[in-house]
Amino acid sequence: MKTKIKELYVFEGLGKERIKTPVEAGEICAVLMDLDKNVAFEIGDTICDIDNPEALPPIKVDEPTMSMLFTINNSPFFGKEGKYVTSRHLRDRLFAELEKNLAMRIEETGSPDSLLVYGRGIMHLSVLIETMRREGYELQVGQPKVIIREIDGQKCEPIEQLTVLVPEEFSSKVIDVVTRRKGEVGTIDTKGDRVQLDFTIPSRGIIGLRNTLLTATNGEAIIAHRFLEFQPWKGDMDDHKYGALIAKETGEATAYSISKLQDRGPFFIEPGDHVYAGEVIGESLRPGNDIVINVVTAKNLTNMRTKSADEKSTCSPAIKMSLEEAMEYIREDEYLEITPQHLRIRKIILDEIERKRARIAAGYKDE
């Protein structure tokens, strides 16, 4: 196809600038050309000299390795903050994203309110979600799941190349954390006062790994990973060690209630936060067990007490998660509710009795 470049732009800061001089090799630029309306560029196409039409090797876009369920927000706090809250808004926005997000895929779920979105990992999907959040969307997402393929009759999963750079004294901790997630040590190189550790690890082992490593290394770890290939399934990994603290009633959390329940585990909420029944408001210290608690009870007043006495209740600081941390934290029976102003973790089934019935029907013992 013959055409002529009319304008040439280079990127400067957050914008772009038109230039009339040639660009150097390696520079990123944008071009404006006259094109037939029936002709479109594809990823990997080459713009070259008409007298020397030699195309570069085509660029291969990596396939998705992870999926998440995107659905409308149907929590009791639905529609209080967002501008775009309906299934039509959600579907239109996600399908519009397909036009520019080349590594993303969308699959119908059979429900008009939900879509299965495939991406290149937690960070890839979190960028999309954060963008939608800032645009005024309300939505919920499910637990991220890696894509499983059957190759030559064998169950296979995506494997990533993981590189961790840490001070030497933390190297043993890093190896312990990664190998517990089915990671395998590759090479160990010393670079000054730091050690570079290379691993191969299943993509599902990457979920939640960054925060664990930063905690284990006092924030010193530098972490990078990329997709390597599909390999045979590495076996099951340990799930969440602890259960969840679940709100029993809808209302405003009080310092009095939270202070009395500090021994149950750390909280994700603070006094004055509004919660609803079925919301995950903390982490239970009872391994594997969820605990339903009431955090909206206020101190009963008598003629010997005043309302200001409630303010003397002491509470430990709440755990505040980023979007990526919350996406990595949620379990199979939970959703992450995302609004322009809040992130909330909730049980998919909000009603306590219905939740217990579902567990029994699924073969779990009652809590």
Task: Mark where each language-model region is.
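Short, surface-exposed ligand-recognition loops at beta-strand->loop->(often short) alpha-helix junctions
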Residues: 73-86, 162-170
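Interdomain boundary/hinge elements
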Residues: 2-26, 55-73, 88, 101-114, ...
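Conserved nucleotide-binding/hydrolysis modules and their immediate coupling elements
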Residues: 1-68, 78-80, 242, 251-302, ...
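Helix N-cap motif at beta-to-alpha junctions
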Residues: 35-38, 119-125, 167-171, 200-207
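Residue-level signature of catalytic and energy-coupling elements of molecular machines
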Residues: 44, 70, 121, 167, ...
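A short, contiguous, amphipathic alpha-helix enriched in charged residues
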Residues: 77-98, 315-318
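Long, contiguous binding/interaction regions
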Residues: 172-185, 190, 208, 212-214
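C-terminal structured "cap/appendage" subdomains that terminate the fold
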Residues: 280, 284-287, 294-344, 349
